[in-house]
Amino acid sequence: MPSPSGPIALIYDDDAYVEPAAGLMGRQVAGGAFLDAYLAHGRWDELVALVKSVDRVESLKRICREHPSSRSRARRLRVVEESRFLEDFGDLPPSRLIHAPGPPEAKHAWARHQIGGHGFALCGLTHTLASVAAIGRLRDLLIAPFQPYDALICTSTAVEATVRAVVDDYASYLKDRFGGDPRLGVHLATIPLGVDTDRHRPATVEERAEQRTRMGIGEEFVVLCVGRLSHHAKAHPYPLYRALDLAAATTGQPIRLVMSGWAASTGTAEAFRRGARLFAPRVVTEFVDGTDPAVRDRVWHAADAFAMLADSVQETFGLAVVEAMARGLPVVATDWDGHRDTVVDGETGLLVPTAMVRGATLDSGARLDLGAVDYDMYLAEVGQAVIVDIAAAASTFAGLIVERGRAASMGASGRRRAVAEFAWPGIITRYEALWAWQEGERSAQGGPIGPGVGGRHGPPERVHAAYPSRWLDDETRVVAAASAIDRLASLLAEPLTHHAAGRRVSDPSTLSGILGLAADPTRAGGLLAALRSRSVGPVRAAATLAWLLKYDLLRLASVTEEGG
């Protein structure tokens, strides 16, 4: 199987890969699982971490250091700060592929455009696709200078359809407005989220008995939900409560619903509890702390079935569904977003039909764009227009309760499917195959090309070209001011005159040498060449020359000084 011909650069931030103490999000669970799997199964010896600042990488260093794979493999972690992106990813990038924990970012495509050439490829994956920011990132794929060798990983076919719908709508607008034939500029690849099938495995007889005893469960049929308690951003609980209550009435069997989750506020948590009492009086509902990893891990052992009746456009995949399959549990899920890719209806679980009323959300996107509603209210408004077939859900639950053998058979089929299709070793192999394809496509491009024209934020010397009295060039004659070398040290020591110093040379001996070369009037181009001979890049060299002129260490040579 092909693999990238060098290290990948991972855009790293704790928010994308580390589970927080509070406010846990599905994307963080998925990000942490990906990182663990890439450490365990990736065929690499060096990893580049692209970070906002070096202090943001300490957790990654710890994760790499403590990971079991580090005991048997010598690996190198290289850290690159984003503030040095143009320099480090210029002539000889430390990596030929940059992977983001979300859709690839336009700023990196624009940076590549400014650098010129095809020095690296960009890759990223989808999570939520409903927010203003997410929609903006998708539109950027159409108008930013992305290349055909860049890639967006869609976690399901429904997600890919959403991406195409957003991009196609925007392309139609651009075509109507400007003409031409705007098209999506990146490659779309469908790769699902993965699951650790060693950690997420069926409970032993002993584990099941112990956990059910711990929870005081007898012969009840236990339906488990794992995830955020969010009626607008995850799953409204009413369809589940109502369906289970109807199933209890139909079968006459005791049912226990276990909600292993966490809520954004005590008000939301209480609303879920109150709803269970009101809408599922025949069902014993228990809430357990889903923020505790140990509790969240053990609670699976007590379950007979897993339920996820998602009805939010915030959802894209539903990782907990795949975890449930890996645990050998039959899944009852809505026929919604990525669920129809993960659950084989009638084989590994059952899909409950959903519907929406055309026209009910026609102005919702515009209301969000205008700020008439915030994102949470937008999700709530749209969610109120999503219908889950409660009668079908009730019939589904009743069937599993009555036919325990069928439920067990579905659970076993789900386990086999999880191992075959969603286990991390295979998913990482698919990632590496995609990255290898990207590298092949990128390296097949033509030779070096110059910096591209235009840009999201053009160079000030072009944007503000009309501001100064004149522009200096290589032929401009300059000369060191009197006592320049004597004044240099104080100017370097004073914050008022030495701020933004990272963009230029600050070494006193180098600067003194340049001033010495200008003891007599000389070409500015000669001083720039002298700086470049000291391995100073062209931008830093020009910025250094500008600083010397700004603080009267160099002056524009007059006719008198030229001897005229």
Residue ranges and their predicted role:
Residues 330-333, 343, 350-351:
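Short hydrophobic beta-strand element within catalytic cores of glycosyltransferases
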Residues 290-293, 299-303:
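Short alpha-helical donor nucleotide-sugar binding micro-motif in glycosyltransferases
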Residues 147-207, 217:
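Donor nucleotide-sugar binding/catalytic pocket of nucleotide-sugar-dependent glycosyltransferases
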Residues 196-290, 473, 477:
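Conserved catalytic-core segment of nucleotide-activated headgroup transferases in glycan assembly
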Residues 1-93:
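N-terminal pre-catalytic "stem/leader" segment of glycosyltransferase-like enzymes
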Residues 301-316, 329:
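Acidic donor-binding loop of glycosyltransferase active sites
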Residues 57-145, 555:
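Extended catalytic core of nucleotide-activated donor transferases of GT-like folds
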Residues 370-517, 521-529, 558-564:
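C-terminal amphipathic helix plus adjacent low-complexity
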